[in-house]
C-alpha cells in the first residue's frame, strides 16, 4: 500500500508540516509527504496518484483543516484503489468531531494503519461534501470570519464574535425555497439558516446534525425559520449543543427531514459553505452518494479525551 501525507503548509499557523514530520520520525512503514501549493492542488495530486498506482491501494491522509480533507475526498472519489483519512491541523476540524474529536486522529502512524469503513458523500454539481453543506446565518458568520481573521482587534480570537455581530445585522432573513425529496419545507421562501448534513458539526462548535450518520445513505436537512434577534440569542446555545431537534422551543421554527435529494432555489443567489469552503450559487441540488469512499478510522486511544466520550461511530 502506498501512503501519502498531504499537508497544507498554511495549517496550524504554518506548523503543520513540522508537526507531522516529527510524529513520523519513528514510523516503521514507507510514506511520502506532499506539501500543497495552491487551492485544489490536493485534489489534482490525489487523482494523479490514483491513476499512477491503479493496481495498488493508495491511502491519502489529509493534514490540515476541513478544506484539505474536502479536497482529498474530491480527488479520491471514483477510484476503487483510494483510501483516505486525516490528521487534523486546522482551526475548526469539524469533520472529526463526528468521531469524537481530533485526538482520535492525532497520531499519523495510527491513522496510516487504521482499518477503513465505507462512508457516504454529498454531491453538489461536480463537487462533493464529506461533512456538511450549509447556508444562511451561519454562512454569513463564516464569511465575515474569513475576511477579518488576520485583522487586529476584530480578527484572531475575536473573529467569531465579529462574524456573529455581522450576521445578526445582515443575515437574519434569507430567501430561497428548500425542497427535501420534493417536499417544500418553507412555503414563504424564507429561512434563517439551513444545513444539509452527512456528519454532525459546523463552525468549530455547532452540533448542527446530532442524528446524522455518514453511512446511512441519507442527508439530514435542518431548516430554521426566521426569528427575532432576541429569540436567536436565547436559542443559540441550545443549537450549539445539538438540542434543537428535541427542545420544545424549536418545535415551530425547525423543519427536520432525512432525504436522498435536497434542492434549493434562490433567484437572488447567496453564499453556501461546502465543508467550510464558500461558493456563490442560486440553484443547486445535494444528492447523497452511498458508500462513496473508504475512510480510515483509528480505534479510540484509551489515554485520549475521546475515551471519555461514548464511542458512537466505529
Specify the residue positions occupied by each region the protein language model found.
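Short Gly/Thr/Asp-enriched flexible loops that form oxyanion-binding sites at enzyme active sites
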Residues: 68-81
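ATP/NTP phosphate-donor binding region
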Residues: 1-60, 70, 302, 309-314
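ATP/nucleoside-binding phosphotransfer catalytic cores, i.e., glycine-rich phosphate-binding loops
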Residues: 180-184, 213, 223-314
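Gly/Ser/Thr-rich active-site loops/lids in small-molecule metabolic enzymes
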Residues: 149-159, 210-230
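Catalytic core of DAGKc-family lipid kinases
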Residues: 4-6, 12, 36, 78-193
